[in-house]
């Protein structure tokens, strides 16, 4: 039945044998490969480029998702105290999302203390200690199926040590500097050339990208930290009005005890970036 269905759908396709597929069961892929001379291509990039310019309705949905995320983050900020686990704190955002009609989370990125360096460790039952940094990335698919993707770094007790203040300030400077650069028609290559330079002792721990698109999840574009000849990514595109992008920063010294993760979500307007979230970037 599965093979017959694929054959029926494939018959009207033109002589062009390039077929881009977003999602397909293995039976369908096998049938296409075994019965037709199609060159199967991953459709993800094409679809994400097609939806990179957001409509007014999409912006409304995204703002609703961000409002829900901010409500949950504010409750997390109020609740954070030594003795609770990372998962207890993280559950507050999940509960808020579901209570307000939200959907799901792409990741489990909330970490405390030494788990904040390097980044990308998973939220766990680790007990948060006095004076520790707590960093998180929402990656939250909220109401109406749109993504709220912002990051904040708090500190238990709300008083940063000198070292914590240093890395938090660098991450803050990184986001603000790069956000100021972006305007319609700026090429990804030019952005990468002009972007804020990470401290040398933090480079090996850098976040995978400086900028990424966002819509119903993380999307195109994806602007990496370039290598010397710009061969490690696609820098050929340009920023366009009504794109929505996230500006990322992670500051964690190689071998350091803690790291700071900050990120904000912006709408590209004719005059530059318009911050979609109202939560202060320097909230600790």
Regions found by a protein language model. Give the residues of each.
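Flexible, acidic/His-enriched mid-domain "rim/lid" segments that flank
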Residues: 10-105, 159
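Active-site cofactor/co-catalyst pockets and adjacent glycine-rich loops in catalytic enzymes
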Residues: 90, 94, 98-138, 145, ...
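Solvent-exposed, amphipathic alpha-helical segments
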Residues: 68-79, 170-184
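Single conserved hydrophobic/aromatic residue that forms the stacking wall/gate
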Residues: 1-9
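Short, contiguous acidic/charged loop-to-helix segments that flank catalytic cores in large enzymes
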Residues: 1, 162, 233-234
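Glycine- and charge-enriched low-complexity intrinsically disordered segments
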Residues: 170-179, 274-284
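Short, acidic (Asp/Glu-rich) active-site segment that either coordinates a divalent metal cofactor
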Residues: 40-44, 51, 55, 59, ...
């Amino acid at each position: 039945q599965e093979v017959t269905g694929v054959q029926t759908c494939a018959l009207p396709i033109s002589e062009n044998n390039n077929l881009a597929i977003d999602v397909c069961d293995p039976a369908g892929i096998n049938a296409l490969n075994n019965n037709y001379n199609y060159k199967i291509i991953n459709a993800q990039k094409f679809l994400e480029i097609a939806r990179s310019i957001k409509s007014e309705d999409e912006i409304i949905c995204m703002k609703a998702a961000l409002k829900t995320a901010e409500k949950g983050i504010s409750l997390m900020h109020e609740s954070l105290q030594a003795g609770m686990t990372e998962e207890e704190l993280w559950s507050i955002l999940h509960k808020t999302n579901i209570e307000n009609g939200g959907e799901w989370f792409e990741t489990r990125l909330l970490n405390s203390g030494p788990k904040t360096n390097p980044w990308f460790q998973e939220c766990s039952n680790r007990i948060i200690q006095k004076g520790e940094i707590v960093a998180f990335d929402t990656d939250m698919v909220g109401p109406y199926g749109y993504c709220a993707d912002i990051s904040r770094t708090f500190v238990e007790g709300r008083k940063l040590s000198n070292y914590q203040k240093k890395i938090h300030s660098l991450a803050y400077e990184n986001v603000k500097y790069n956000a100021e650069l972006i305007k319609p028609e700026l090429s990804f290559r030019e952005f990468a050339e002009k972007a804020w330079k990470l401290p040398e002792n933090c480079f090996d721990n850098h976040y995978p990208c400086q900028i990424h698109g966002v819509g119903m999840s993380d999307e195109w574009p994806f602007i990496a930290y370039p290598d010397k000849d710009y061969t490690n990514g696609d820098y050929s595109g340009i920023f366009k009005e009504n794109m929505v992008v996230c500006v990322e920063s992670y500051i964690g010294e190689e071998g350091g005890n803690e790291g700071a993760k900050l990120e904000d979500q912006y709408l590209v307007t004719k005059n530059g970036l318009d911050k979609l979230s109202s939560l202060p970037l320097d909230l600790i």
